[in-house]
């Protein structure tokens, strides 16, 4: 059962490729992936992570730093790797100038 929903959209041009911002948003594992991308891909990657992590945070009862949330692709789908957040389903989408993230938090009661 879904008990909370978060959604966020960001315009890619608002994303700055500054070290401080990258460290604020991305986990250590995500930074490794980020570093393999072209400049355009980096902006899109960072925008997507920002949007989906904002969406995740909106579903939570307590604050968490963005860089503590680790997302990897499994079977071509984004999956939160943090054990304590695995009850949250996510999706990231890109459309021309925008990235959007959605998070659906499932209740522990089935």
Swiss-Prot record:
SUPFAM superfamilies, A to Z: 4'-phosphopantetheinyl transferase
Disulphides: none
Family per record: Belongs to the P-Pant transferase superfamily. AcpS family.
Alphabetic keyword roster: Cytoplasm, Fatty acid biosynthesis, Fatty acid metabolism, Lipid biosynthesis, Lipid metabolism, Magnesium, Metal-binding, Transferase
Molecular-function GO terms, alphabetical: holo-[acyl-carrier-protein] synthase activity; magnesium ion binding
First-level EC class: transferase
A Gene Ontology cellular-component term: cytoplasm
GO biological process, one term: fatty acid biosynthetic process
Chain residues that bind Mg(2+): 8, 54
Species annotation: Mycoplasma mycoides subsp. mycoides SC (strain CCUG 32753 / NCTC 10114 / PG1)
Cofactor or coenzyme needed: Mg(2+)
Name of this chain's protein: Holo-[acyl-carrier-protein] synthase
Domain of life the protein comes from: Bacteria
